[in-house]
Structure formats: structure tokens, C-alpha cells
């Protein structure tokens, strides 16, 4: 009889424990990360016209316009500054997992790290590139939370050994309904919070080369957690999934845009 009562109590307890207390298996979390990556990846090329607004405490707001080019199958990325005039022709090129910056005023290329502030803003290379979460991070379950009107999974991502990223730890909020990323909080190795990023709007575009929709954040809001009061707004104004010229991802091509 005591055994029956114990079994009954265990059954009742399992029914009243909230679903949020049930941790996700690592395989399920990896699958979620792969889905995020796959939905943002295009089998062909990718081009976007991007508006960037940089706000710094006690300084005037600065607005940039850049063109972003991607060839996801070959891990290639180019960021070309179009406006303002003083920045036009400046650019970044990622080849073989190395990031280079070109300054047309001196005609020189310099290698940059993943911590590079793109154009001096709060953005990083990864904010414009394809998502590689499953490839670069190992997930751990941190629970379920309400984020505004959204029900979200919260995961803690730690960088895998030997992988070069801007920040080694990311706290990630993933919309349970849509699978879209809602929020990132990025930490230094010391545990210090460095950036908070929100993704309030997502969009999608059908890709002929992929045969599926490609998802992209329509808007990104980045807040500097070290220099309080500094923030960056990124808006994807136009996305094109048609093929790009074969030689576009070269230093010579980018240099030609400043002549």
C-alpha cells in the first residue's frame, strides 16, 4: 500500500510540475541551432542594402549605408560602405575565416579580429554574416521565459575549442512558436556582459537556388553594455538572392569601388 501511494504521489507531481522545468536534451538544442542557421543560409548568393544608425552618448548620431554581399556555400562575406561620403569605399572582406579591412584613404588592407567594431559602430562581423551557431557553440538549457509577448526558450551557448568568435558566451532567447531569435546577451570570458541585441522584426524571401525561404532579421537593435548610452540600429532595407559576379569576393574588386 505505501508503494502504491508513493507511485500515485509521483504521478501527481509529474502532472503539476510546469513544462518549463523539463530541460531540453542537448540533441534537441543542437537541432534548434541548426534550424536557425539553415533558415538564414542561402545555397546561392546574397546581397542586402543596409541602413546603420550609430548613437553615442554626448555625440551626434551618425548614419551609414552599406552593401553586404555573401556567398554562404564558400563562407565569403563583403561589407562595402556607400555613405556618408567620408566613409564611401571603405570595406571588409572575409576569406578563409580571416577578416580584412580596407581603408581607401591610405590604400591599405589590415587584418582584423572578430571583435572589430564594424565602421566604429556596436556591430560585429557576425551581425551581417550567415549564422553559424551550431558550428561554433555548444548549447546548455537555461529554462523558458516570457520575453514581452513571446514565449521563449533560453539557452546558454559556449564557444567550442579552437573557434574564433567575438564573445565566448552567448545567452540566447528563441521564440518557441516561430523559431526566430529574439535576443542575445554576449559575455566576455570573465563573465562581464558586453552587448545586448534584440531582433524585433524578421522577414523571409524565397530563394530559387535553395528551393526554400531564406530568413533574415529586418531590424537589429544593439546596446553597448560597457559604454552605457551607446547603441546601434541596423535595418535591412533590401535583400536580393540573385547570383553575384564570380570575382566579387576579392581585394581587387573592393579596391575598385573607391577609385
What are these language model-derived features?
Residues 1-5:
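Positively charged n-region of N-terminal signal peptides that target proteins for export
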Residues 68-69, 140-146, 200-207:
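Short amphipathic beta-strand and strand-loop transition segments with alternating hydrophobic
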Residues 44-78:
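N-terminal, post-signal-peptide region of Sec/Tat-exported proteins
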Residues 132, 150-251:
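Gly/Pro-enriched, hydrophobic low-complexity segments
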Residues 19-23:
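Signal peptide processing junction and immediate N-terminal pro/mature segment
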Residues 79-85:
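N-terminal post-signal-peptidase region of extra-cytosolic proteins
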